[in-house]
Amino acid sequence: MQVLIVASLAFLAAWLVYSRWSDSRRRRGGGGSLPPGPPRLPIIGNMHQLGPNPHKSLAHLAKTYGPLMSLKLGNQLAVVASSPEMAREVLIKQGVALCRPFTPNAVCIHGHGEVSVLMLPATSNIWKRIRRIAREKLFSNPALQGTQDIRRERLRKLTDYAAGCSREGRAMNVGEATFTTMSNLMFATLFSIELTEYGASDAGANRKFREHVNAITTNMGVPNVADFFPIFAPLDPQGLRRKLTHHLGSLLELVQNLIDQRLQARDSSDYRKKKDFLDTLLDLSQGNEYDLSIKEIKHFFVDIIIAGSDTSAATAEWGMVELLLHPDKLEKLKAEMKSVVGEKSIVEESDIARLPYLRATVNEVFRLHPAAPLLAPHVAEEEARVNEYIIPKDTKVFVNVWAITRDPSIWKNPDSFEPERFLESDINFEGQHFELIPFGSGRRSCPGIPLASRMLHCMVGTLCHNFDWELEKGAESKQLQRQDVFGLALQKKVPLKAIPVKV
């Protein structure tokens, strides 16, 4: 044991000497310099400056060190882009050199890092196949048109649940209700089943499923010592790998069981094919065009379930928080709904184009509460030059979307909820306007934007069109706090619970 400790200390000392020499050499020049950044402490670099909310800490540092700054996180060099111009540089202009995804140590489990579309490089054949399938078979306009009835039914059930709460005078946990809606949508689209029930968050499958998804998104977003100091990775000092082994493993097992049941059913002579994504992929896996394995399908589905359930639900909850904080905006939205949607109980996807204030409201929610405030970090595949600065190979690259959307030089009154700012603007969240890129941009942008957009507009619109909302007595200030919890998805710290009142 003593020999191991001495060897580790010797290695750490040698690494520190080399790191300081290498860092000094880069800053002196030699073909270019690093972007400016805050002073670094020995060994830990700037880790102490991240805090519990890295997106906010990095935004504060960017005010001093500029829209492209460098930091040292343990022995990892990192660069943070905090302006639309720098975001365009790292995501588009240098997108090839800087597009390798960062794979956290904690998710190198169950083979997930080897086949997850979120972790694979854009040069990977698996990545290309799965992105093509997602784009053509799941998120294209024809594919979404074919699954519109599934989404309409989920919205109807959400409305029915809110109406039940209204009849009983019972508060509805908005985040849980929207999570149930989105997770049931994912499972209905993928497997033709519903996994969870409204109002049953403390029982059975509901509690376990949401616990798994929340644990995955939270723990994947936590800064991990094992990523900053790979020498400590086998020790898993924060226990993140252990936690994710359990939670990710449970979701993989759930999906594998559903796939196995379908494979067994398809062997039956009287099997009637289902019009879901699983049957589509199983058919494709038997052909030569896509060369899909069951393992790839399983991990792809887990990626879809996590991303589709949690981020959209969190964004819808934030939307309701802002509207309840600003009753004048809510009334303006309700008036538009009454004029366009009329007596219908559900906002249809075909209505969205005729609801400019609803579209502006969703844009403003994405601006104030981007689901992934730092996007998914990338790694430099090769050395790249951004303006006069050099980004060395293997540098971790972040885009601080949260800093961009709170920048007073871009947005007037950036901390205020003002949907009106988008009524006379062509800016949207689909990846072309770098002032607002909650889903990223370029080759690694989220392919699920069309689905997320449809559901967010319809969920927020339907809840506002059918109900007035009251907060529980004595809980008003707590319920409407804007405090968030950092992770892959930016969650509200105190869940919003409000009583729907049928209009």
UniProtKB/Swiss-Prot annotation:
It holds the Pfam family p450. GO terms for cellular component: membrane. Heme binds at C446. It is a single-pass membrane protein. Its EC number is 1.14.14.67. It is found in: Membrane. It catalyses: 11-hydroxysugiol + reduced [NADPH--hemoprotein reductase] + O2 = 11,20-dihydroxysugiol + oxidized [NADPH--hemoprotein reductase] + H2O + H(+); 11-hydroxyferruginol + reduced [NADPH--hemoprotein reductase] + O2 = 11,20-dihydroxyferruginol + oxidized [NADPH--hemoprotein reductase] + H2O + H(+). InterPro entries: Cyt_P450 (IPR001128), Cyt_P450_CS (IPR017972), Cyt_P450_E_grp-I (IPR002401), Cyt_P450_sf (IPR036396). Pathway: Secondary metabolite biosynthesis; terpenoid biosynthesis. It is an enzyme of class 1 (oxidoreductase). The chain crosses the membrane at residues 2-22. Highly expressed in roots. One of its GO terms (molecular function) is iron ion binding. SUPFAM superfamilies: Cytochrome P450. Its cofactor is heme. Its main location: membrane. Belongs to the cytochrome P450 family. Monooxygenase that oxidizes 11-hydroxysugiol to produce 11,20-dihydroxysugiol. Can oxidize 11-hydroxyferruginol to produce 11,20-dihydroxyferruginol. These products are intermediates in tanshinone biosynthesis. This is 11-hydroxysugiol 20-monooxygenase.
